[in-house]
């Protein structure tokens, strides 16, 4: 053994200095110390003191290797030796980092990088305001926010009153309802109904991802399938799984989706789970956080009863008077990655998470009490695992709830671990704090709130003051905190990184929960970023900004402008800003791109865009990219040099081409990239080869950026590179052909003997100077550009002659006259050389400039040696090529051209051929800086909507690759908030009231002259409000109304009085019961007068009542008016209508667009008076003529003058209202005065028969946006249309001071014969469908000149039916009508398959129109839907009775004087009405206004999926009688395609829509079911939620039978979306939705039985049945029930229950329903097996959680259900259709492990069936009543999928129902 040469002393940790002489001795000593001796630190300190004491240095450094004693050792030694000591952890960190950079198998060793964060906090809507709040020490406590609940109503100082608390305040997020649903493709209606915490989680997740610069799928660690989402959420009442689920769904992440509930520590526990997922390799990126939004007082009461909450204010953390915690809102999100992935992806690392851990305080004295030992265990574990000494931790963010027990326990555990004594050095201070003292306790969001606070502290290098100590510090804390170097900041404290040791700050974050859980994180600073020495060489940069709306884009630009102004002196700003805004952002359709070489120039560019408002139109990605390859004559030295020097892709391709050139014997081409070379000194071979290689390298460059050509066109030499880009030639062959041709030219042709002349003139003009014997046309470049070839002398002579005639001509800088006789010597040899080249089939179209044709890939071989031979000799016909491209639609308005060449030669030619608007973009430019050219071109491509690979663009410039912390996305937020009302939590647990509750604020007993006495006023059950009022028609004031309106001597009640009563009651309903509808007005819809109310004698008591029923979950109420006797018993029904509540501003906005057409019609009538065609009738004449029909009192005589056009049934009048007492809301005499024009028009025109009188039978809608004034002068206008024999309809417009203020829409008159009998027994008229809003527009004169299509579209108004559909759509989605525009994308507003079903179902039911639910799949925008509807004649025929069918536009004189010439107008086609109606349905279902729909949008962006499409089509079918295919939205995905289809639809049915009766409310129907056996559970049946239905197929007005399908185990009507539309159209098919479709757990919680479940569905069935019977003349219709799977069992129970109420079900349809006798329900594992196969997810993957929950609930219901046989008289004829196959039919496919004793129904589902006897069903309905059908090649689930088998099954069903089989 050699002796050791001691370079440094070796010190033993046990025995002291080692004096070993040999290596063997040293090893023995080391082993003894390791295995035998104890660690003796005092001895070690003594030895080190001796060594360091001999040194002259004033400081020493200890470097630990795999030990954590270094910090303590330094402290003790420094004290002993009197010198400064420090720890250098470089070795340990290097080892840790090296380990973290290992393979994926080593992910468990990785540190976790935090790369993004965002949040919403009390009084702080963003991170900046949160930091401002923290650093200023703000206490955010305030009284309960008024948008949450009435704090005083739920407050009880004594704490004794049930469901109250002693808390009056908290910490609140301002406006937590703010959300941008369109951005996330959620409908406004769905947004309002979703948990606000989910919405804020979505927005903060996006903002955090944006801060992280995360673009999904950009790198290996950001692949969507490798991103997980983890959130903490504990508050009951929300569906917690949907919080991460919504985020995953929006971003299409498919990694783990987990909600963690550990009460107060939920968010930190969720972050721990996220870290574990990263360490385990389950995901590569994690979105983690927590949410807490306090929406009601419920939990306040419980927590207060548990003594958790402070009653005196905010959390007084560390204060001696701490008395509990303060509840708070909070939402926070962070983005996590493994450190090595974050470094590799150049992510902005905010901090590094060293470790995380969670445990439980099992040894605590109470589950809610923290345990110091458990907390210490976490601290020690994390320190030990990370090798960090406790003294290295400089800040601890405490949980700090402000409870006495919690604060003291936490302080004890922290101090015992991190500062047990005074061992911390002076530079090892430890600060403590808690965010809860500022923003309260966010409960499940508290941990992430603390984490974000710490991240902000690191960013700002400041410890904010702690504001929790209001008086004195907690007396339980140790008094020597300062001696321990522990501080609680009272002012902001600088917090810099340590200069010694690791140079990193270490932080602990502690979080524990009321349920006993403890979670903690150990953080440190991010690693220092290494800045490359090389600067970014690019002189010009591109900055991109995008948004999903124009307003968001403008606001994003404004925010960016402020950011640039604040950072304008940052020298690297522009390059890094370019990288951040391009490569590290998700890009959206509304775009702006600015190119700039300085920050000032960038600011100018932003300002220019904002001033020009260039952001209003979205870009589309459907662009047609053309690569245009220029020829010769534009080459210059150094072309492409900037790319050659700085872009690896371009340079690699150039060098590869150069190598091929050399290998083929050609010279090097690299000289052309040298600016110092003279081009004239390069031989043509080098120039031509170099040009072609340059072009091929540019193609590679563009392709690397994701820009690939859709077609190519090459000019002359450029066609070689074009053929290579199209795949015809390889790179090698392209070089070979170019080189051979150039070499032959040099060899066989004399350079400089010939020349080419570019002439700027048409060929015909040039021919005058052209000599064919010496001149040749070589290029036809454009209609005004030609090139001539010939000998130099001849060309110079021609140039001179042209100049003398002022024709521009320039010699082309080329050595040869290409495409002329000069090249003929090389042709044969060149052709022979080309024979060796293999010409491949092209991949994309090539526009040949030789042939002037488009050569498509499928064309037979065109390119070959002979082609190239001709190409060399024959002229270039660029003009013909461009025209051919246009003719073939290869070149169109969507085309974007990129010139592939050294200069913009072809760009000008393209504009000359195609037009100046052609988008042409250069790759290079002779005069301009290359980087500027490239930036401008990329900006152009970006504006065009192209998806660019920005990472590749920036890849070679490392210095710019830093993600800047830019302002976050600027949302188009609106407030979606459901107000907590009626203080319902106060009565939780109370016994159900035996009578309905009466609200505290009752209607006044004498409200108005028309509403005289309140008879009944109830709020309940459920959402229903009922008001019954009584009035005396013989009372003095109403007798005046009656006496002033005598018909044939009878004092008849005018319908205007009914309208006044409706508006009065509507106002009172809004005031008392709907404070959420402040500012709304009441519209009177579908007023139908059945029998007149007549006052027999003046002053004789004539009692009548008005009854209003309102469902508070809707915007409508039903009103009926009927006479009663003195005992209050109903005697005669007089009228009924619908009250609809709406914002009158939306009416005014709609009418404003109509006013122009109405005003022109009035002027047209006035012109007819001037021409003598029509007469102006005075007031006296009008009422004299009227007197033969109606005897009006002066109060009714408001008409001052009338212009009557009898032939067109059109009139206008001036109205001055008579002075009246103001004792009505809307004076009925004034309303009648306006409406009299209708009666006068119809009874005074030339075609009225002598014995006819037209009587008003109601109207479709009456909307009054403003109060009428007695001193105002009004103008009215109406045009009546014959819709059915003697029935006429029209809209009356009321105008004041140039503004339409009211519209009486769809006024209907019918002509009973004259006489008193006609009055007493008028023809009954059914009411229009309930629940509609419609507004037709009047006719406007059309000019004599045939208008353009654009003019027709511009002047075409919405029809009434369109508007009614829009209202339905707006209601279902949750938008106002004014927000419905054509560019509205249904997918943006959450119109999914279910919502589509709902909308189309309402259209069918309310408008009697058959619209397929797939309309919303085929029509992706409202604009497309409008066009679709406009094309369908069937729609217009169906609603012809409702409105005028077009508009007229006045004829103006040719001289433009404006003089009106009376011309009989043309009517617009009815297709526009159809389109408008469908648009209205879409808008209502999506939840936006019609105006928001646009042809530029895709329906999917509105949120329209298969289910919402079904809903929309259902409503179109029912309301418009328009039958669209169920896949309509699949085949019409955009508004344009829908518009085109609807406007082109012909052959529609000519049937007329007959108005239906009023739809009974659920409140009416419940009483009819009261004698059913489930009466004991009647509260469950009667209360909300309610079953809903969707009319999936058929029409109410034409149906011969109704089939109602009960939901299967999923609870969704969507299961029948494919089947129902295939069933015969004379069967109205309804599908039911379970009331608890998305909340199956409630079924179990409430203990719902199957009987009760069915009874809830039957309320909806009764409503459907009554609606159909009222709409039919014969008053009855056959009913069939049915169901698939478990739905069949529900259906037969429905048959039994309906029979008990006297309703007979004629037919029963069972679709693969399991045997109900002895039912053995499948176990949950089967459903999970099916879910894994994707069966339960309807082809979209795994089923949502709510589907599985509903399945579980149904299994439990069926388990306890015992079916009872039906009696012989009640058993319907029944059909059961079985699927023959089992799910596991394929032996090679997935199989489930089963046993013979497994559940019968499980085996029945999985394996092929052999028994089709249906014995169980026969025992219930009788063998004689049952028909069995079998469908082969389908299983239980696939039988419901689209395809031929579903048509087979639908035929079986249809034939059975109609008795055809």
From Swiss-Prot:
Q: Where is the region Product template (PT) domain?
A: 1008-1312
What residues does the Ketosynthase family 3 (KS3) domain cover?
109-525
| Record protein name field | Polyketide synthase 2
Please give the residue ranges the record annotates as the region Disordered.
1441-1470
Q: Where is this region: N-terminal hotdog fold?
A: 1012-1146
The enzyme's first-digit EC class, named in words, is transferase
Q: What does this protein do?
A: Polyketide synthase; part of the Pks2 gene cluster that mediates the formation of infectious structures (appressoria), enabling these fungi to kill insects faster. The product of the Pks2 gene cluster is different from the one of Pks1 and has still not been identified.
What conditions trigger expression of this protein? Expression is up-regulated in appressoria-forming germlings on locust cuticle. Expression is also up-regulated during conidiation.
Q: Where is this region: Thioesterase (TE) domain?
A: 1582-1855
Q: Where is the composition biased (Polar residues)?
A: 1442-1462
The Swiss-Prot or TrEMBL record annotates one GO molecular function as: fatty acid synthase activity
For biological process, the GO terms are: fatty acid biosynthetic process; phenol-containing compound biosynthetic process; polyketide biosynthetic process; toxin biosynthetic process
NCBIfam families documented for this protein: PT_fungal_PKS
Per its UniProt record, what Pfam families does this chain match?
Acyl_transf_1, CurL-like_PKS_C, ketoacyl-synt, Ketoacyl-synt_C, PP-binding, PS-DH, Thioesterase
Give start-end of the signal peptide. Answer: none
Q: What is known of its domains?
A: Multidomain protein; including a ketosynthase (KS) that catalyzes repeated decarboxylative condensation to elongate the polyketide backbone; a malonyl-CoA:ACP transacylase (MAT) that selects and transfers the extender unit malonyl-CoA; a product template (PT) domain that controls the immediate cyclization regioselectivity of the reactive polyketide backbone; and an acyl-carrier protein (ACP) that serves as the tether of the growing and completed polyketide via its phosphopantetheinyl arm. Lacks the starter unit:ACP transacylase (SAT) that selects the starter unit.
Q: Which organism is it from?
A: Metarhizium acridum (strain CQMa 102)
- This protein's record includes keyword Repeat: yes
Every copy of the Carrier domain together lies at 1356-1433, 1472-1546
